[in-house]
Each structure stands twice: as structure tokens, then as C-alpha cells.
Amino acid sequence: VSVPPTSYRDRIMNALEESMIDVDAIRGSSARELVEIGKVALLNQPMDEGRIMSWLSDRFPDTQKPKGPIYSKTTIYHGTNKQKRKQRYALVQSLYKKDISAAARVVLDENDKIATKIPPVRHMFDYWKDVFATGGGSAATNINRAPPAPHMETLWDPVSLIEIKSARASNEKGAGPDGVTPRSWNALDDRYKRLLYNIFVFYGRVPSPIKGSRTVFTPKIEGGPDPGVFRPLSICSVILREFNKILARRFVSCYTYDERQTAYLPIDGVCINVSMLTAIIAEAKRLRKELHIAILDLVKAFNSVYHSALIDAITEAGCPPGVVDYIADMYNNVITEMQFEGKCELASILAGVYQGDPLSGPLFTLAYEKALRALNNEGRFDIADVRVNASAYSDDGLLLAMTVIGLQHNLDKFGETLAKIGLRINSRKSKTVSLVPSGREKKMKIVSNRRLLLKASELKPLTISDLWKYLGVVYTTSGPEVAKVSMDDDLSKLTKGPLKPQQRIHLLKTFVIPKHLNRLVLSRTTATGLCKMDLLIRKYVRRWLRLPGDVPVAFLYAPVKAGGKGIPCLKQWIPLMRFLRLNKAKRTGGDRIAAVLNCQLYASISHSCKTGPVSVGLWRSTNTGGLSAYWRRILIGMVDGKDLKSAQNHSSATSFNSIRMNDISGEDYIHYNQLRTNSIPTRKRTARGRPNKPTACRAGCDKLKRLQHDIQGCIRSQGGLVQRHDRVVDLLFDECETKGYAAEKVVHLRTSEELWKPDLVLKKNGRVVVVDAQVVQCGRLESDHRVKVSKYRDDPELADVIREKYAVQEVTFEACTLSYKGIWSKNSVEGLQKLGISNYCLFKIVTSVLRGSWLNWVRFNNVTTVVHW
């Protein structure tokens, strides 16, 4: 191990001492033990791996070794069809609380019913052992020492608390071979982590047990008897993953990658590469310039790159010796535990990077850069004064040239350089496209007789009828194909799946639509196609919520905080996202990308994206916030949506839409949405467009039978009003008692003129707060709140009676005011929050009011009382 410079050594020693002081302040045997391990480093003694692992075992005593997924078995349901449906419902609901992604896979992929075809376990292990054992020499030998580049010196600095907080892994991720879960590791005090990581930085390595991994295999497609269709995923210890994530972020910020490589960078690399390819094809056709493209596929790239090539790459990049030594140690004598179908076997890894480790991507692309730098500029395509000869996103590469000879020369160079670092082009899956101008017809034609060779193998030339895919976008030989996306199958599975209605909407927004979003944004789309998808989505959502067809469309598209469902309107959302992503690509992709994306094609695309939303009245909005504001304005401007105008006063009014509030039944969720949208079939509503239909109240009231009258004003619903009101008071009473108030319900306070009966009297710290609850109509929330507060506050004698009875000087009055649709008065909710009422209590009040309002409507229809005037 190389000796670091004195200045660097002083920095790490100072950081170790500071970390030890912070940990020592925690106190306890665990803190003292880790401080002692740090003192060993300060004394320049070798790393005591056993002591570090013993400390970790004491901190995480209940770890269980993961076993990996099992594909050959399906979930077995027993009994009648009804019992099987109940069992599947129980499974999905249980998964939904633990891992929403797993629940989504059960519903959308039906992996609980269909077993994946797999090869025999022995065949699987033997195949991947051979793949892992094919390497290009040890990572720790023949390291070419070089002085670090000045801009890379901070790469091996001591770890800070801020970096640790920002690098935390998701709690839902899997544990490594040590069994330490991300949830338990995230619960550990960051001061412990800082000292431990700085010990790693000081020694330039991690303990050998930590750098091990377990490898699970996931099918790339539906599976099959061939082990090659499975993708190995190496899961390291969460301790190593978090440390490597910090290093990866430092590396990306310090090193300037070749601008032709766009993966693992803080830019939209997929959009940049797809947009560049589309622009190049369009410019070649517009200017009738010859264009030849090679679409290259590599054979198991991440499993084949030589470890020695990784070390050479980081050394040439000017990384500090500490980083070079750390990477060399991490990839030296690597052992992984292969896990498949409940069986385990150890294997040595002599090539490849850890797939799943945050540092693997930056390391791989750094080695891949060597092949990009070997390309000759003579084989290139000129667009907007920019010479483009290649484009890459991780291992997905393209070579471009204006002549076949130039492309063939670069293809040879590229293949030779890749072979030196352990990578090989798959000639069977790689393709070529040749566009040649036809002078007589003034058009571009596809030529399939221009042969390109990779060593002795010929790359497949595409014809005019062939389709090919690049980064998820389907291309024809003339550019991106019009996106053919069908959501009908996924929506049908959501409908039939054992889900609550709110879960269906959540999966629609977080899984089904995002599944197709990238392709819709980056491919060509038509307004008709997007409208058809919007119609299909609306049809299913109305079915899930049992909403009539005349419910405002804005209710589905308005944001959740405004009282809507927050479902994106694809006709507007897709052009807007395309415009935003193109602009971001121009800003972050560098001058070369910006020049290419300023061509005529993208000028027209940007113009059409901006004018599309303008045509529906978005005030020339070019952000998602403007789109949300537009739909909110439409919603509250309609008869069935105007009552939601104040929904934004507090999040508890709409938080029943949140998937975290999983205790709401599906039936109640449907009723709440029917209330919010006036979708309950009252006489007044069903008479829309039927002028001769009677609309008077069936109870004989001299009123129109509106929803508001049925729930709030009819004689049939008076008993329900009292029960709903009492439920609100009970919730407030229980909450105030937990907050330390001495609470009393329905206190009788007599003045000279009147007997007052406030719902709650709260006493705490020499102060009394009088709270009265009311559930009112939707249109006058703030004025009704002021009237209620003024009713108590404007009687000076009442305050004196309270002071005398409770022996306090300070008396204040508050009102709990919300509408029968569960919408809060802004002043009311602010006053309740000042009393310490929690958001959860406010949410429970909202759902209690909504449920009470629904039961009031049910009561109205069940009661037969008639008033005779």
C-alpha cells in the first residue's frame, strides 16, 4: 500500500480524532469499543478485522442470512374459488404493507400464478462459475503508480456526516451476505458510521468479510432453460454499498467523462442519446447526406470487463493512490455466494463489476472510455458544426459515419480496444443501418448491400421494413416509430386484482403509467393516440370509483392537494414532459449536445410542445405546476367541483387519498369520492336535463332535494347530524387529553342571560381554551367559523364566568369548523394546530365527517318520515 502525502495523512488523522470524540460522547460499551478500534488506527497498527466484525455482530445480533428468490414455485391457494380469492387478497394486502413493488408484481405480472421456466440448479451454477472465472489478471498486481490529478485529490478525503445522510440506502433494499438490512443500518447513529468509514479511508480497504457479496439471478425475459437469459445481481453488504455510494458521488463530481458517454451522470442521458440519434437521422434525410450507423451489443459486458482494466482506468484518470489501492483490494480475491432456488454455492470472480453496487457504473464507464477515445474522427457524421462518431449509454453503443470505410475503420478500432479490456461485441445481435441519398429521386434510400465485418463475422444490415430498439425506443430506418402503447391489459389486471380502489389508482400512477412514460416521451406520438389512452384510463377509473360519466374530468386530473386524483392527462402531460426533458438535455449536456438539439427538427418539436398546452388555456405554462393549477381552476369552476375550492387549506382534507392511510376500506373510499363530486343520485342531480322530473324533497320539506339538503337540512337526517358532531367532539377530546390538557365535554356555563354549552373546555398551564365544533355547508367556511368564535368571544360575562370557575386569567375561544365534505376552514385548522392537535387527528376528523355524511344520506333513504305542512 502506498504511503499518502503528509498533508493528506494529517487530514485523515484529524478526522479520525474528531470522529472518536463524537462517538465517545454517545457513551456506552459499543461506543467505547469502536473508539478503541479507532485508537488502533491512530497508533499505525494493522487493521484488526476480527475486532471490527465482532463490533458489527454486537450491534446487529439478530441478522438472518438472505436466501434469494425462488422462481420454480408458485403460491398455492387451497379450497373453493372463493377461498382462493380470499387467500390471494390476503397475500396482496400483506405485501402492500411491506413492499408495494412486490404487490404490484403479483397483480400485474401474476407471478404468484405463473412459474418462471428455469434451468437445473447445477447447470446454472456451472455456467456462471465459468463466466466469473474468465478474467484478465488480478486487480492488485502490476499497478502503474502515477501522481494524482489536482482535481481528483478530494476523492479520498475523510467522510463527513452530510455525505452519510445523503447516501442512505432505501429501507426496502435487500441485505448483503452479512444479513444487515438497510433499515437496521439506517437506524444506527451516523457518528458511528463516520468513524467506521474514516477507519476504512485510513487503511485504504474494508475488512474482507464486508467486501464479499451474494449473487442472485433475475430473468431478463420470461426465463427458460438457458442460464444466459438470467442477469446476475451482486448484493454487497449495505455497509459497503453506502461507503461506495459516497465515493461514486465524489467521482462523478470530480471527473469529467467523455461527452459521448452519458450514463451514471447527473444528466438525462437516455433523452440526450435518443434525441441525438433522432436528430442525426432527421438531418441526414433533410440534407440528403450519407449516414451509416452500427448498433452494437456487447456480450455480458458487466460480467466480463477485466479487473486490471478497471485499475488502469482509474490510474489514468488521476485518482489518488488511496482510491487505487481501495479498488484494487475490493476486486482482489473476490468471492461471491451464488443463490438460486434456495441453493447456495461459492464462486471466485476474476472479471466483471458488482452489478448493484453504486461504484460499479462509474468504474465500468471509465474503462469503456478507452474504446471511445480510440475512435478516429475521420469516420464521423457532421451536424450543426459538431462531429459525431459515437454515442454511448453505459454499454449500449452506437458508431456513426458518413462513409462505409470510415465506419468499418472505427468498428475495427472499437472492437480491438474493447477486447483489451475484456469486452466483446456480439455480432449476432449487432446491426447496421445505411442511408444513402438517391440523387435522381431526391430522397434517401436504405441500402442493405453495404457489408460491415467484425473480424470474420458480418453484422446484420437492416432493410426498410426492419425495426430496432435503442434505449427502449423503437426505431425504423427513418427514425423513431410512432409509439404503439396499450394499457388495456394492465388496467384490466388492476380491475381484476385483489386490490382496494385507492390501491388501483396508486398503482396506475406509480407503475402502469410510468412503465410507458419514457417510450411515450421519447418516441413519436399522435394527439389521437394520447386521447384514446386518456379515454381508456378515465373509463377504468370511473369504474373503480363507481362514478357516473358526467363527473368533471378535472376531478381526475386535478392534483390531490386540490381535491382531485392527480392522474396525469397524457394529451398534455407527454408534450410538456418532452419539452422539459429536451430543455434539460440542452442545459446539462454541454455545448456539443446543445448544438445538435438546436437543429430544425427539435426547434419544431419544442414549438409544438409549447403550443399544445397553450391551446387548452394553460397561460403558456411550461412546467408541471402550471398544468396542476390549470386543472384545479377548471375543477373549482364547475358546479360539482366548486365545493373543493378550500381543499388546499390543509393536507388532512385530502390525505385519505394517500396510500399510507391503509386503514380506510375500499367501500368508504368510494363513498368519500362520490360525496366530493356530488355523484350521489339525489333527485336534483338525476333531474339534470329532465325538466319535468320532480326535484322536491321526498320528506315533504319545502326544499329542493339536493345532496346538501339530504345530509345537512332534512328532518330525516337530524339524528345522524348529532352522531357525526359527537364523533368529532370525542376525537378532539381524546387528542387533547393525550396532549396534557385537562379536558371537559359539554360544560354548562350560566350567565345572567343565557346557558352556554360549549363542546370542550381545555385547561393547561393556567390557560383555558373553549372549543365548539360544527359541520357546516361548503360555501361559507370562513364566515361560519368567524360567527361561531364571535358568538362566544363577544359575551364578556362568559369569559368572567370561566375565569372564576377555573381560576385562570387567560381565556381564548376556538371553533372546529369543516364542511360536510370534510374540507377545513383555514382559520379553524390553524387554531387547532396551535393547540397541538396532530395531523393524524385532523385526518381522523375528516374521515369521520365524510363517513357520517354518507351514513346520513343512507339514513335519509331508509327513513320514511314525511312532514305534513
UniProtKB/Swiss-Prot annotation:
SUPFAM superfamilies: DNA/RNA polymerases. Pfam families: RVT_1. Residues 199-475 form the Reverse transcriptase domain. GO terms for molecular function: endonuclease activity; RNA-directed DNA polymerase activity. Keywords: Endonuclease, Hydrolase, Nuclease, Nucleotidyltransferase, RNA-directed DNA polymerase, Transferase, Transposable element. Its EC number is 2.7.7.49. InterPro entries: DNA/RNA_pol_sf, RT_dom. Signal peptide: none annotated. Residues 601-869 are annotated as: Nucleic acid-binding endonuclease. This is Retrovirus-related Pol polyprotein from type-1 retrotransposable element R2. The keyword Hydrolase applies. It catalyses: DNA(n) + a 2'-deoxyribonucleoside 5'-triphosphate = DNA(n+1) + diphosphate. It is an enzyme of class 2 (transferase).
